[in-house]
Amino acid sequence: MRKSGTSTSSKSTRRGVCAGGVTDVGENRDQEAEPKAAAARAAGATPRWHFIGQLQRNKAKSVIGYADVVESVDSVRLATALDRAAAGRPAPLEVLVQVSIDGDPERGGAAGDDIWRISDLVASSAALRLGGVMAVAPQEWDPDRAFEQLAGLTERLVSTHPEATTVSAGMSSDLEAAIRHGATHVRIGTSLLGMRNTLR
């Protein structure tokens, strides 16, 4: 599945994207995502909204107000905050565990045993649903090497949680490598809409 990011786009462009058949939309800034989601609803568009940016725990309640999927869960503390915020939703919030492929603590993403702790916590929650994993290939890595490593982590996760089959990996610059190694969702907003501008 392809997923469009609308971070760069005007309201008219976003309406056109939805009218053109895009069913999943990704956003990485909470302060921009909520008004975009509200505008889409007012225009009669109902895409699935994916939050893909780094998320602070104090924004959990805001995000669950519009997001169908949060792809950037990289700590037990954030998963716990989302679990509390999502209590009472009509349907569980889908969560992807953001994986750090290179283990660099300066980047977003869980590494080592934290991946499995987060996965187990989400899978045990009534308010959350474990969908799978999300990752960004490190810029200095060969994309095939990065996504091959992610595929190994995904295989291990699915062996424990068979429902966690979503692999959100690959962007406009490396989507071919991601697909070769099992990506089910690619993030191609830049290809569709161009580079980021401010919200209009």
Residue ranges and their predicted role:
Residues M1-S173, I179-H181, L193-M195:
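Conserved alpha/beta-domain cores
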Residues A183-R200:
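Gly/Pro- and small hydrophobic-enriched strand-loop and loop-to-helix capping segments
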